[in-house]
Amino acid sequence: MKTAVNGLGLIGGSIAKELNRQASPFEVYGIDSSELHVSKAIELGLVRSTLSLDEAINRCTQMILAVPADKIQALAIDVLDRIGAHHIVFDVGSTKDEICKTVAAHTMRHRFVAAHPLADTEFSGPEATHLNLFRGK
């Protein structure tokens, strides 16, 4: 299953790490505005490589939006405007009210899952990823 993680910090990177640990054949790709985060995520084996948003939509069936909460609304609409019926988009931001209101009337709303892993630490970035961050969540 080809998955793109958009945002390779603590939460997105930890999700990528967990997906890579699974027995099923996940192919995890990364998107991040920070070249440092991208190169570190590749070096740590969190993602196979980086993709542009267009490449991720064309290549992957799952997209995880792990960018800062204030950027998720615009990104969610941009992604939902461009996906097909075979895609699923997850948001793992810390707030839900405005995000859910923003996507509520979108024609691809049924392909969007608003989620929160209820996990965090005081650290950030790909080096802060934690394999067991979501255990028991």
Regions found by a protein language model. Give the residues of each.
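Rossmann-fold dinucleotide-binding core
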Residues: 106-137
